[in-house]
């Protein structure tokens, strides 16, 4: 076990030094049940610190290296690889049962078809939990941003927030755009707001065209509808970002959250 952990820590250190990778500060916690070993990590990424959001230094991301067995629907490869992704039920459990974070959000990128008047194009969409903008301490340039009420029911909230740059370049910064309708993958969505100037994304260095509520995943990513991602414990697809409570360190957060994550994941795989 000790040798394995040393090898893993060395590999993680090498990854952070590799060209093209964002520098990270990584703390690891190893947990074992029988022959299975899983390592859950909470890390502070340079990309997070550079975001124009409230108290960016408090933001952390999660990853894990798995020794679990079981079926997974993951963007991240097989269960032996380093994962950035978590299921939606896992996200809700970690968000609601932790004692070390003041907030936690979930997000994923996906390509969508956007139609506005006589223009149609494919754009990146950032599909986010309802508390995404509020947890980051962001305010709209126009209209409103998402709230938890936009995640109340599956496929029941066809609303969209335009990214600031997309609003300027494709909508000519029209001040009356709020309340208008555009089509996402052929479905009508109401524009409720424009994102803040200068903010791109919490999970990618490149800005999306639009932000969509996670409750609309089946329409935003129709190829996933058969997986029922919002209820499927085996579908790993979301990046999670959390804000540390004042005075809580990454080490303390990991020591608290790691065992919770491990027990939840073990239960998921019992199925």
How should these model regions be labeled?
Residues 225-230:
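Short, P/G- and charge-enriched loop/turn segments at secondary-structure junctions
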Residues 183-223, 242:
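Basic-flanked hydrophobic alpha-helices used for secretion and membrane insertion
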Residues 1-29:
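N-terminal Sec/SRP start-transfer signal
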Residues 31-35, 39, 245:
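Hydrophobic alpha-helical membrane-associated segments
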Residues 239-245:
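A bilobed periplasmic-binding-protein/Venus flytrap-type ligand-binding module shared by bacterial periplasmic
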Residues 28-33, 259:
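Residue-level recognition of pore/gate-forming positions within transmembrane alpha-helices
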Residues 10, 36-178, 183-190, 198, ...:
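Structured, solvent-exposed hinge/loop segments at the ends of secondary-structure elements
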């Amino acid at each position: 076990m000790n040798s394995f952990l040393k090898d893993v820590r060395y590999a993680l250190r090498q990854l952070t030094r590799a060209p093209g990778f964002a520098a990270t500060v990584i703390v690891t916690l190893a947990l074992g049940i029988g022959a299975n070993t899983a390592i859950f990590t909470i890390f502070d990424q340079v990309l997070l610190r550079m975001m124009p959001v409230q108290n960016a230094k408090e933001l952390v991301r999660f990853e894990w290296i798995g020794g679990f067995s079981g079926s997974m629907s993951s963007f991240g490869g097989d269960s032996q690889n380093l994962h950035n992704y978590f299921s939606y039920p896992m996200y809700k459990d970690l968000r609601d049962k932790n004692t070390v974070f003041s907030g936690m959000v979930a997000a994923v990128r996906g390509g969508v078809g956007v139609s506005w008047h006589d223009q149609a194009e494919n754009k990146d969409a950032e599909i986010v939990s309802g508390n995404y903008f509020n947890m980051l301490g962001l305010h709209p340039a126009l209209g409103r941003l998402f709230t938890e009420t936009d995640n109340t029911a599956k496929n029941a909230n066809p609303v969209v927030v335009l990214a600031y740059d997309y609003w300027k370049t494709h909508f000519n910064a029209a001040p009356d755009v709020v309340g208008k309708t555009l089509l996402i993958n052929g479905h009508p969505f109401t524009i409720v707001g424009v994102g803040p100037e200068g903010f791109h994304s919490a999970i990618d260095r490149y800005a999306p065209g639009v932000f969509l509520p996670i409750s609309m995943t089946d329409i935003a990513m129709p190829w996933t509808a058969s997986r029922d991602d919002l209820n499927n414990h085996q579908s790993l697809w979301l990046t999670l970002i959390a804000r540390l409570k004042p005075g809580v360190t990454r080490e303390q957060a990991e020591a608290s959250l790691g065992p919770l994550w491990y027990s939840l994941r073990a239960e998921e795989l019992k199925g």
